[in-house]
Amino acid sequence: MKRVKLTAIIQKEGRGFVALCPELDIASQGTSKKQARGNLQEAVEGFFETASAAEIKTRLGTERYIENLEVRLA
């Protein structure tokens, strides 16, 4: 089975956490960071189990760049 490394961006939002996989544009949430990550992993695995080969190729083939920005605060 082929494996691919993807990005998980997890941030606190209100009383919970939101997790995003930007490569696939899939998000999930949870009450803890660990739960949000686990839920995201389940969502991503579900996507790969159900999506067509064309949809997978389209999402993984899109160029995305994650970079840090430094801005001045007023």
Language model: regions and residue ranges:
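Short, charged, surface-exposed hinge/linker loops at domain edges
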Residues: 1-5, 9, 34, 38-74
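Short aromatic-glycine-(Arg/Gly/Cys) micro-motifs in beta-strand/loop hairpins
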Residues: 4-21
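Intrinsically disordered, low-complexity segments enriched in small/polar residues
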Residues: 12-14, 28, 59
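Compositionally biased, intrinsically disordered low-complexity regions
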Residues: 16-18, 32, 63
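A short, exposed loop/beta-hairpin motif centered on an aromatic-Gly-Thr core
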Residues: 24-33
